[in-house]
A protein has these predicted regions:
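Extracellular protease catalytic domains of secreted zymogens
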Residues: 1-139
Length: 139
C-alpha cells in the first residue's frame, strides 16, 4: 500500500512547527528520562508538534461539546473546500545539507507545492480559525 512504512503510515496529513530553532520550553519531572533530574529543557520535532496538534484538536472537541473521533475525513474535507484554518504550504523543501570529511553533501528532499504534498501534507493550520471549523466539520 502506498504511503505505508512497515505497519505505519509514512506520509503527512498536516505539518506543524517542528524546528529545534523554535523549540518550546518544557518542564520535565522524571517522566521520560528517569536518570535526569527534574527541570526545564526544550522540545522540538514530533515531540513538540504532536502534543501541540493534540491540544488544538482538544480545543475543537471542547467547542463541539463532544469527542470528535477520527478527524481525518473532516480534515481532508476542510482542505478540499479551502476552509478557514487550513493553510496550504506552497514554498520550501526538506532537503538536508551536511559536511563530512571536508565535503559538502546534499540529500534531496520533497518540495512544497499547491495542494497536498509530501513535505507538508495538506499544509499547516491557523489554530484560531481551525478550531471552530474542525468543531463544525467533525461534528
Amino acid at each position: 500500500m502506498a504511503g505505508v512504512v512497515g505497519e505505519r503510515r509514512g506520509i503527512p496529513d498536516i505539518s506543524m512547527d517542528a524546528s529545534c530553532a523554535s523549540a518550546a520550553a518544557v518542564y520535565g519531572n522524571n517522566g521520560s528520562y528517569p536518570a535526569e533530574p527534574p527541570g526545564w529543557s526544550t522540545a522540538c520535532g514530533t515531540s513538540l508538534a504532536a502534543p501541540m496538534f493534540a491540544g488544538i484538536v482538544a480545543l475543537a472537541a471542547q467547542q463541539a461539546g463532544h469527542t470528535l473521533g477520527a478527524i481525518n475525513p473532516a480534515l481532508y474535507r476542510m482542505a478540499a473546500s479551502h476552509a478557514p484554518g487550513v493553510v496550504d504550504v506552497v514554498h520550501g523543501d526538506n532537503s538536508f545539507t551536511f559536511s563530512s570529511q571536508g565535503k559538502t553533501h546534499i540529500v534531496p528532499g520533497f518540495h512544497a507545492q499547491r495542494g497536498y504534498d509530501l513535505i507538508s501534507g495538506l499544509g499547516t493550520i491557523d489554530a484560531a480559525q481551525f478550531v471552530p471549523e474542525l468543531a463544525k466539520a467533525a461534528g
